[in-house]
């Protein structure tokens, strides 16, 4: 299949992703709540819209996930101040009698989002951050406008603001202001060692995972997988040959991808926090979750997704394994007779400047799917999703978006993982290991955080 130049130029690197090909729009239609949405799912959609407006894309996944996690912790703890159904995360609050749950949700979300977006000056242009904040303020005014004035509203707002203040204080020095790009990182030179990828003579900060305070993990290395395979192994050769055949851009490099495999590659190029929150909105609305149930599932999801990034970045820089684009171009030095060098091999999309093993996208998918399986007590769930990284006319922001349909959380996670082969980013070993790594992080979140007070609760 020939990939149009517009899509080939999509870059998964920070603001470049916001600008390239016009695939990310600030239109509120990008994250409209699903039918049956409540105040919690509505604010999840509002946060996604603020993310898009603020250009928090591509390389800023950890910051994006953290913002959602903090917002949903504040929402969760505020609601539990009205009716304690699960253990709080940042603060044990008690609401004044009659406090409005919807007002509490809105105030908690608004205060966290405005504060976090305002703190992102270290990597966001001022106009981007201001656009995100304006989006939040518009949504806040609209939400409060639907709640009758009076004591219930006033008390709900006060409760939400107290919950927001608690999580903001708890995470005020958590290391997330560490610069993402490290221009001084020394690339490797031996076969198998990570080297700068074409077009990016720098690396995403190799010490970032060391600087970040996890939400649910004991430390960044808690579930670090074992090392990647030997360059001389049969499995390595098989993985090189697979991605060499399927991951090319079909312009400089011929590709054997099918049309559907190309769609999968581009569909899952969306950021993991945007995609998995979008999926969770659809499922939670279809399942009719109430405010408290919604607060818990989104809280668990985003706490775990944030730590998924921390865990995978620690793993990547512990092993520093080279990317497929480097491995294929330098296959003549890997010592494996079953691989063949192609010095001009080019992946479908530009490779992010961070080591291969394990796949962060796969970790995020494994994490999210495990949280959702555990929360809903089943893997079997039918749902559909759109994407913001498909060609123009097919995205979530378009009138007739292309939808992909899934019958289980595992199916979505597996497709998410294999997409990184089709896009030319990761070896199969990295995506399979990443999915398993993520499942362990998801289990950790569900086993130890936001646990129901009543063990007979539906969720």
Model-assigned labels for residue ranges:
Residues 2-3, 29:
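Intrinsic low-complexity/disordered segments
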Residues 3-15:
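Bacterial N-terminal signal peptides that target proteins for export
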Residues 14-26:
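Bacterial N-terminal signal peptides
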């Amino acid at each position: 299949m020939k990939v149009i130049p517009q899509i080939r130029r999509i870059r998964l690197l920070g603001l470049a992703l916001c600008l390239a090909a016009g695939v990310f729009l600030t239109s509120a239609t990008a994250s409209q709540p699903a039918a049956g949405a409540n105040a919690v799912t509505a604010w999840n959609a509002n946060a996604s819209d603020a993310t898009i407006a603020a250009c928090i894309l591509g390389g800023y996944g950890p910051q994006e996930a953290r913002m959602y996690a903090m917002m949903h912790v504040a929402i969760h703890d505020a609601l539990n101040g009205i009716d304690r159904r699960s253990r709080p995360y940042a603060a044990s609050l008690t609401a004044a009698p009659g406090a409005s749950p919807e007002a509490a949700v809105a105030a908690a979300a608004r205060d966290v989002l405005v504060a976090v977006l305002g703190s992102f000056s270290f990597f966001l242009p001022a106009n981007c951050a201001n656009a995100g904040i304006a989006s939040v303020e518009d949504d806040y005014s609209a939400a409060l406008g639907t709640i009758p004035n009076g004591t219930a509203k006033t008390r709900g707002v006060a409760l939400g603001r107290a919950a927001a203040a608690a999580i903001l204080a708890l995470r005020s020095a958590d290391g997330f202001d560490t610069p993402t790009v490290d221009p001084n990182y020394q690339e490797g030179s031996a076969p198998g060692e990570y080297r700068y990828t074409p077009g990016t003579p720098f690396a995403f900060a190799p010490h970032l995972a060391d600087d970040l305070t996890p939400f649910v993990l004991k430390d960044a290395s808690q579930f670090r997988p074992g090392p990647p395979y030997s360059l001389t192994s049969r499995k390595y050769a098989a993985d090189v040959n697979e991605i060499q055949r399927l991951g090319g851009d079909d312009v400089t490099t011929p590709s054997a991808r099918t049309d559907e495999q190309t769609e999968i590659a581009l569909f899952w190029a969306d950021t993991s926090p945007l995609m998995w929150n979008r999926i969770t909105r659809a499922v939670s609305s279809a399942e009719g979750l109430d405010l408290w149930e919604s607060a818990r599932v989104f809280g668990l999801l985003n706490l775990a997704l944030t730590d998924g990034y921390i865990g995978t970045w620690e793993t990547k820089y512990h092993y520093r394994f080279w990317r497929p684009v480097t491995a294929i171009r330098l296959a003549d030095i890997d010592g494996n007779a079953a691989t063949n060098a192609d010095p001009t091999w080019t992946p479908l999309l530009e490779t992010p400047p961070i080591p291969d093993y394990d796949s962060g996208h796969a970790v995020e998918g494994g994490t999210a799917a495990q949280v959702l399986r555990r929360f809903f007590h089943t893997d079997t769930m039918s749902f559909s999703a759109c994407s913001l990284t498909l060609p123009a006319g097919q995205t979530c922001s378009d009138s007739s978006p292309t939808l992909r349909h899934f019958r289980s959380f595992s199916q979505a996670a597996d497709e998410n993982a294999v997409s990184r082969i089709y896009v030319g980013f990761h070896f199969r070993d990295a995506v399979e290991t990443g999915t398993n790594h993520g499942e362990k992080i998801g289990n950790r979140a569900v086993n130890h955080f936001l646990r129901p007070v009543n063990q007979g609760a539906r969720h």
